[in-house]
Amino acid sequence: DQLTAPEHSFKREQQLGKVQEKRIESWAKKTGCWVDDTSVYNQTLGDKLAQGGEAIVYDNGNSVLKVIGLDYFIQPIFFLFRISLHNAYFEQTKMFVLGFGRNSMGDFMIIVTQTFFQGSQMTEEDIEEYTERIGFKLVNPRNWTYSTPGIYLSDMHNENVFRGHDGVVYVIDCDIRINTPELKAGGTRTLTTEVEFIKE
């Protein structure tokens, strides 16, 4: 578990990610929420609805199950931050972590559930109006990115944001993070990537 790479380097981030994966895996195995091979487990999740850059989504009746990789997050803790932020900002579409595992390639995966919603697509203008109404400013229309000084919100397009039959706007998937200066979206927050683990 030694961190040998220089601080603030990409290699250090990767090392921290591996340490976090190892600790989460150990805990998840002890508590019964670990899946050795999510590729095999997928057969019991339901019909495959969609597959994106990081997730495979399965039909589970009134909910969907998502098996999500860390493609956009080197460290598991940052993905878990993303879930917490999503749940804080978009309560109607909360995600709940069910467990953790690895796929057949050995990649670390997080398994979540989310209520299934139906509705109609919104225009980009409607999404922009909604997002600005909840306090965000459009900073990059090419990748649907909005921000406040503290929060970065991206991927707000019409496959991830829609209006339900009840008229409510539902954000089912987005890239939401603490807005740091490195994201180049007016961010003022800082994050520490150092995590201290206490050995049992």
Regions from the language model: what does each represent?
Residues N87, Q92-R142:
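Conserved structural core of kinase catalytic domains
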Residues D1-S63:
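ATP-binding glycine-rich phosphate-binding loop
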Residues V64-D71, T115-F117, D173-D175:
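Active-site ExK catalytic segment of metal-dependent nucleases
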Residues S63, I110-V112, Y152, Y170:
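Protein kinase-like catalytic core scaffold
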Residues L70, Y146-E200:
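Catalytic activation segment of kinase domains across protein kinase-like and atypical kinase folds
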Residues N42-E91:
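ATP-binding glycine-rich loop module of kinase domains
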Residues Y72-F81, M122-I127, T180-G186:
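Active-site-adjacent loop/helix micro-motif of nuclease/hydrolase catalytic cores
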